[in-house]
């Protein structure tokens, strides 16, 4: 796990969206310079490869729900179904993602009935179900209790290690995130400074 810390307005979300490949095709803006992520120039993956390789979970979970499902299970299935995976594979991914995020009890609930913290965990489950090589979490713990954050960080750390995936956390506060990261950076004045 890698963490990038920064104050409000420091550019954390912009950097997260750039890493996710959202610029310039999905968000307006001008990019100068070049960079690579997962051995590919940023923003050059075809959409189907991008969604299967990189997932971004943002701070506002309600904006990331599809709006076209009637249960948490259907919401978590939405991404893998769009990859045209076999039904058995989709169900296995749903089960694993719901278990990892402690969302099994929410499986048959309508997404509109969830609390903020529950919705945040479901959106993370949706990203996990895509089995990305890179999972970007942009203040994705903001609505979780400290206990839920610790539990999820431990499970995500194990998940990333087992899969060989990279998780990049974008956060304002270092606690408890710094304890789970192999590298940490401070984003300030448009530059990244190493913390450890």
Enumerate the language-model features and the residues they cover.
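Hydrophobic anchor residue at the start of the ABC signature
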Residues: 124
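ABC-family nucleotide-binding domains
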Residues: 145
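Conserved ABC ATPase signature
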Residues: 110-114, 118
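ABC ATPase NBD coupling module
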Residues: 30, 40-55, 82
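Q-loop/switch helix immediately C-terminal to the Walker
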Residues: 60, 68-81
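Conserved catalytic motifs of ABC-family nucleotide-binding domains
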Residues: 131
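Conserved ABC ATPase "signature" region
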Residues: 77, 88-106
